[in-house]
A protein has these predicted regions:
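DNA major-groove recognition helix of helix-turn-helix
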Residues: 67-68, 454
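Conserved hydrophobic/aromatic packing and binding residues within compact polymer-binding modules
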Residues: 63
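FIC/Doc superfamily catalytic core
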Residues: 33, 60, 74-480
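Charged, alpha-helical scaffolding/interaction elements associated with membrane systems
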Residues: 44-45, 69, 296, 460
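Short, amphipathic alpha-helical "recognition" segments used to contact nucleic acids or chromatin
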Residues: 31-47, 427
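Short, Lys/Arg-enriched anionic-surface-contact patches
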Residues: 10, 14-37
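Short alpha-helical "recognition helix" segments of helix-turn-helix
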Residues: 51-53, 438
């Protein structure tokens, strides 16, 4: 078994504090500059991307981004450092960054003008006839590159190994659909647990409350969409998805045949109005525009799915269930477009954690002249982060399976308690834990017994032992 040699590396030492103060380098810029220098140093020393990510405690995505140093230009004078992926801020944020004495409206208009010069204008419009647009920022390009190339390759590599030897693809899909059904419903106010969601999906338990019905309905809608044989998403498919999502959850007075017949508003987590849905007389024409847009241009499908998501919520065609229907339909669209990697994880899981930001991005589009860049960057960021999470999960599972297969091949037997220790350490962020960590987490564990088990696992080469202060630190002795 091989192990990456642990080395101490101080990313900050390459930039002097005086330089930072003198040139007013922001904390964000400083952090990025430090990351670049650290990554380039490890690359030059022959480390791989995975090893560099582990040693610097960065995500693989971050390391990939800086590996060939294409996103950031390093100059001798730090004050000249410019990021090509400069944060795409709103006017609301810009007013805190503008130099004293400069006119906010005038300076912002210059920024807006430059953005519009390179923007992509869509055929989607608001009720006043103004087109929605976006800028394909370096952040968006980087996310698409990661999703389509790096993530796809790694997910396929790990998933093929896992499905071949340890779990079924059906089991993985059910697990992912259970998560998506649960989190998409909680965003809209359902109260339940992941355990209940998995019971509803995997054990086919009958839902007993409105919240459980929302989760179950969401699952049935996703399942229906994935089994649909048509190559494209259509209005009829979307209406069927809504029908399944809203079944037995709408109040009697809000039951509808197709689209809503009353005007509505969208509220954020604090109950504040962030958007007024389209007037009932305009819903049909705007939805027609949306489905026509999905198949009438060469915009990247990942960007297009984010636009579909936004515009659907923007129009708000139904009295309830708009968010769930938008997320389910955009998910199904991506799978139909050949992005099977989206079957591996739940996008809604992170949206649920970032719910305030989610609603804020919707509002930012309206407050900044229908610029959808804010929402697209947010959604693609969520997708990229979701991929990081599932890749980390697959990597840990892959290492776990590798360890246990090695033990079987070598005829080494270990106890169930020792297996639990291995699994516990594999789930720790840095693949390391002390005896104190383990016994605190597992209150019934006997300290002496755990000490004996960890030392045995060290003796047979599964773990390594080092010092962390006064305690022994046990780490997984395999990087595969």
């Amino acid at each position: 078994m091989t192990k990456v040699k642990k080395v101490k590396y101080n990313k900050r030492k390459h930039i002097k504090v005086g330089d930072i103060m003198q040139n007013k380098l922001t904390k964000r810029e400083q952090s990025k500059q430090n990351n670049i220098l650290a990554i380039q140093t490890f690359k030059n020393q022959g480390y791989t991307v995975a090893q560099t990510a582990e040693l610097l405690r960065l995500s693989k995505r971050t390391v990939y981004r800086y590996w060939d140093n294409t996103d950031y230009k390093i100059f001798n004078n730090i004050s000249e450092v410019k990021t090509e992926t400069e944060q795409y801020i709103t006017k609301e944020k810009y007013k805190y960054q503008i130099e004293k004495g400069k006119d906010l409206d005038y300076e912002w208009e210059k920024i807006l003008s430059k953005r519009k010069e390179i923007a992509t204008y869509t055929e989607l419009k608001n009720e006043k006839g103004n087109k929605l647009w976006f800028v394909e920022t370096e952040k968006i390009k980087s996310a698409i590159d990661y999703i389509e190339i790096k993530a796809k390759d790694d997910l396929l590599k790990y998933s093929k190994s896992l499905f071949k030897n340890y779990i079924s693809s059906e089991e993985m899909l059910l697990d992912s659909l259970a998560d998506e059904s649960f989190y998409s419903s909680t965003i809209e106010g359902a109260f339940s647990t992941r355990k209940v969601a998995k019971e509803l999906v995997m054990d086919k338990r009958v839902p007993s409350s409105k919240s459980e019905k929302m989760i179950y309905n969401n699952h049935m809608a996703l399942k229906y969409g994935l089994e649909d044989k048509e190559s494209q998403i259509t209005e009829d498919l979307m209406l069927k998805i809504f029908e399944l999502i809203s079944k037995d959850t709408l109040d009697e007075e809000t039951q509808i045949n197709k689209y809503r017949v009353e005007d509505v508003v969208v509220r954020d987590t604090r109950g504040e109005i962030i958007h007024e849905g389209a007037h009932v007389d305009n819903i049909q024409s705007m939805m027609d525009d949306l489905f026509r847009f999905m198949y009438s241009n060469d915009i990247n499908p990942i960007i297009k799915s984010a636009i579909f998501h936004f515009y659907f919520v923007f129009v708000h065609p139904f009295p309830d269930g708009n968010g769930r229907t938008a997320r389910a339909t955009s998910y199904i669209y991506l799978v139909k477009e050949g992005y099977d990697i989206f079957k591996h994880f739940s996008i809604s899981a992170l949206i649920a954690q970032k719910k305030s930001k989610y609603y804020k991005c919707i509002k930012d589009v309206e407050d900044n002249e229908l610029d959808m860049t804010y929402f697209i960057e947010f959604i693609l960021g969520v997708v990229s982060e979701s991929i990081d999470i599932i890749l980390d999960k697959y990597t840990r599972k892959h290492i776990e399976n590798y360890i246990f297969m090695e033990l079987v091949d070598k005829g080494v037997n270990i106890t169930n308690d020792q297996k639990k220790i291995i699994k516990y350490i594999l789930n720790k962020e840095n693949y390391s834990a002390t005896i104190e960590n383990y016994t605190k987490k597992n209150k019934s564990s006997d300290y002496k017994k755990v000490n004996k088990d960890m030392n045995y696992l060290t003796d047979i080469g599964i773990l390594t032992k080092s010092k962390e202060g006064r305690h022994n630190l046990y780490s997984i002795n395999v990087i595969k």
